[in-house]
Amino acid sequence: MMEQGGTAESRIKAVIGAWADAVRRHDLSGILAHHEQDIVMFDVPPPLQSRGMDEYKKTWDLFFRYHKPSQAFDIEELAITAGEDVAFAVAIVRCGSGTFSGPPEEGGFLFRLTLGLRNIDGDWCIAHEHHSVPSTD
């Protein structure tokens, strides 16, 4: 499906890229820029879920304590499925620094990312964000 300014997939990829770049720079307003006000996020550290922009904003305080602007926050293996009004994207995120194979306290780590997006008046907005790591059992 072609939209003004490119395909839905290319526009969503640009939104996700801008979000990841804002995370790397610790730019909170850039992080929030493409999110809906009633965002729902499921994250790895508590709380189990964050509902609404105010709660979502608070989650970044903890992240910024451990992630330095010079460290990785790289989107890999991005796959986007887009319809006219809704889309989802899945990816692996490389976060931090170090080996990326050990626990977070050893440096970098990988996590799974799932995003749910809605097309609102021609702009793709993130309505749901889910971060997860596999069980280590």
Predicted regions and their residues:
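A beta-strand edge to alpha-helix "cap/lid" segment located at domain peripheries
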Residues: 2-30, 40-137
